[in-house]
């Protein structure tokens, strides 16, 4: 699993944190997955910071190093949410209509815009739900 994949999963799990009406199974799996993927996010932030602080490199070289590192293996196992827990997520999220998500953020935006729940659920399922 690459850092990019782990970061996407971590972000989706964090977005699910805004949903307060999860049933116990979904909440339990969300918490455990969050703990798992947070490790890669923390490691990534430290690595990115170290690369950014390199004084002898140009911004172009730093950006290339960051992009290269993002595609490297982060050392985490591929952990996913069960279908049963995902069904509970769907039940909790559907009434919201939309959810703030990094999936729709452009480089010019500072905040995650709202996207339709169906779009968010599909991305969540593709990244985090057992097949």
Protein language model regions, located:
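A composition-driven surface/loop motif
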Residues: 1-131
